[in-house]
Amino acid sequence: MPASGCFAIEYREALDLARLGALVIKSVSPKSRAGNPTPRVAETRGGMLNSIGIPSKGLDHYLREILPPYTAFGTPVVVSISADTVDEFAEAVAQVSLPCVAAIEANISCPNLEADGMAFAMAPDTTYEVVSAIRRRTQHPVWAKLTPNSSDIAAVARACEDAGADAVVMGNAVLGMSIDIRTRKPTLGNVMGGLSGPAIKPIALRMVYQCHRAVRIPVIGCGGIASAEDAIEFMLAGAQAVQVGTASFIDPGAMAHIVEGLDAYCVENSIEYITELTGAVRIDPQLSDRWLRFAQQSG
């Protein structure tokens, strides 16, 4: 499935949307926002930096103009919500809990204005607070999108599970920065931004593994996935599904190629259900006790 913010309805020209597991739409906030100052995107070696700021025209516009076209393909639609406060998250989830929506992805990796701008998902306590508030306002499945910038991702994932999340999405972009040596200015208008693409894949893969070890709810892997081989790695690490982001900017047909590659891998390896791959990484038993304790306890 696409990662939120990396997909638009125009992709129907490049691939069969009915073959995707879900359509995840760009995050919407309950109030209008202009987004961050330009430049908002900068290419880096092995990836890209972005500081978009999640521009939004508000929920009314989103529900009236953005959401309806995505419901025409028979593929489950996942609405991603973003907010500045716990109350705004609760308000947003209540409004998007519609029959045409299959699940709600809460982008809790965004800044929490009630905690000096620290992302909700940076700490277990703020994670639990916001996910609990969201859970109380909807009967829809709730996916909590985490940040790789957390120092204890396993504890954050457990807080999501304890608060009632149905899945965790691991994860968003890694905070980064680049500078133009000619102008000596940051390449992004907001100075720092999220690093995505192949450069962050080993980080994201490690965190998916840690989340899988820490919780019983499904883990959705995201971060640097550009091929079927990448997707298989994430599933072996513990992901039950994957999201594709930056790769689709380079090749709009990337997700179609990944689906085809997964089909071929399953045929070649006599795999009846792709879920057989989830968590099937082979760890040396002599290393497992010490290493897995570390992996489960640390972030």
Features from the language model and the residues they span:
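N-terminal capping/small domains of soluble enzymes
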Residues: 1-77, 83-84, 258
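Glycine/Thr-rich phosphate-binding loops of Rossmann-like dinucleotide-binding domains
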Residues: 10-11, 33, 114, 178, ...
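Alpha/beta enzyme core
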Residues: 17, 22, 84-220, 226-239, ...
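C-terminal helical cap(s) of enzyme catalytic domains, especially alpha/beta-barrels
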Residues: 20, 35-45, 179-193, 235, ...
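Extended, intrinsically disordered, low-complexity segments
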Residues: 201, 260-299
